[in-house]
Amino acid sequence: MNSKQLMNKAADNIRILTAAMVEKAKSGHPGGAMGGADFINVLYSEFLIHDPENPLWEGRDRFFLDPGHMSPMLYSVLALSDKYTMDELKQLRQWGSPTPGHPEVNFARGIENTSGPLGQGHTYAVGAAIAAKFLEARLGSEVMGHTIYAFISDGGVQEEISQGAGRLAGYLKLNNLIMFYDANQIQLSTRCDEVMFEDTAKKYEAWGWKVITIDGNDCDAIRAALTEAKAEQERPTLIIGNTVMGKGARRADGSSYEFDCGTHGAPLGGDAYINTIKNLGGDVENPFVFFPEVKEMYDNRLNELRTIVAERKAAKAAWAAANPEKAQKLEDWFSGKQPEIDWDSIEQKADAPTRNASATVLGILAENYGNMICSSADLSNSDKTDGFLKKTHAFTPGDFSGAFLHAGVSELTMACVCIGMALHGGVIAACGTFFVFSDYMKPAIRMAALMELPVKFVWSHDAFRVGEDGPTHEPVEQEAQVRLMEKVKNHSGKNSMLVLRPADVNEATQAWKLAMENDTTPTGLIFSRQNVNNLPEGTDYEQTNKGAYIIAGSDEDYDVILLASGSEVSTLVDGAKLLKADGIKTRIVSVPSEGLFRTQPKEYQESVIPAGAKVFGLTAGLPVNLEGLVGSNGKVWGLQSFGFSAPYKVLDEKLGFTAENVYNQVKSML
């Protein structure tokens, strides 16, 4: 155990670096990080288990930072752990720097998650804790007995998602989850008591958490709380640390600058910065240094970790020798190796809803993927993720032998939990709900895309054909919104998301195949509620992997190209019959993913939709869904308003999604 004097000096060292980093960057958030320095110091110098030589070691503890604006605190402690250089700390918030304003996932550097909008980071931790429990149930505590730590701020507690994360973690009895709440009672614009007076401890206790309240700047209290939390066998633990915003900060006149909103989101500045560095024992002329005794303490910890890891790896080797099948699973699951699926042998019921086809595939995945977890936001029997559930069983408190998570009515929480599972590694995560409720998931979808995580988002009830439920439940603009992610490039230069809306049950099988093969970005799968006619006999469904392909009229002698995605394709097929009777020749193109189509060679794109061709597009969403493909030489029939409450076949007639209207629109266009 390190002395209190040394631990306090280490925390002050982190505070000095924090203030200096923000000052040099001329922007940032020093106050919260200065207050949280004591906890992060105790955690990394005495508790967090990781492998100094192999940051990807699957048995490591994981730390999830929720308030990403407190990044200087994390970068500083990771620099003490040899993950960053001092020069890199000096480049906080600069172009090309590995120290961006909010941390971005980088396992090699010890960054377990990208910290985005408040509330998401600690929910990732819940997902990681679930993944760890799931894997422990299959592989054993010898290799999966690690701890998930999270750090949350006042803002994260206020975000609505904390309700879902707190409820789920408590219900499932995630005793491998320890969360520190940095309760400094200050936020960017106000004190917390100007917007809330709830009893946070009682709230988490009501959710089933163990709650420990301490002085969050007292290293002895932090150590004792972490020790108690580690010993907890039944519940997740929340450590409420009452901390001092801007601890150690001084104003230009030398008076205390602590507990002040002014330290939250701006450099301390001028004489306030100088006085603060002096007060903390730093050198104003050279603040970017490690105190020798502090660096020695962290070096000693790294050596301790090498011994701990060596012991655990020896135990793992003995476990592997005794459990070769489990050892192979561990290797396969964390390397991303997947089982062989005979996709061509999957039989689908003809002319069925594509959500039903998805259920068929999910059942096969449940039987063949030992490391897949599926979830639904209280809609499994409607979004048909119950195809997976029927082959396994749901998690229950303390029991993770199943592979299905009933997330409850909490779409954003569910999405972030799945992100946390993906970040943990070793598992494949999928989650489902109605497409219209993807609106609740957009912040998480964006973060999954930014982090390049292969979460599978399953959305059923894809269009106005939800029918009687009315416009509140009928997607209109949602497809356009989600498909925008196909147009945004991630930092690897690829489309940040794959979005697939299959035209029939067989395309749905191929869509799932593409989703499972896609291990570099999230995938959105959009399925119908209603029956959809099969595409014409002879359709080469494997061409789904090109994003768009010809399903009828492939010869060059045509008058117009008809294109659509999803159930509108079958409407085009019926419309083409009327056009044919009138002597108009058509080519029909199914476009499950424009983003995927745009990545194909130009020659292929031109062969499917030649420049200058007359093109008619049909979409149950906004016309913009197809305008990029149709171009100025064509026309798109789509929705211009919200939907209506009526049987879906009535809506087809009223809104113009019929063969007759396809005929009329094409005739008028030609």
Spans of model-derived segments:
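Conserved acidic/glycine
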Residues: 1-34, 152, 156, 160, ...
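Thiamine diphosphate
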Residues: 1-147, 296, 302-526, 531, ...
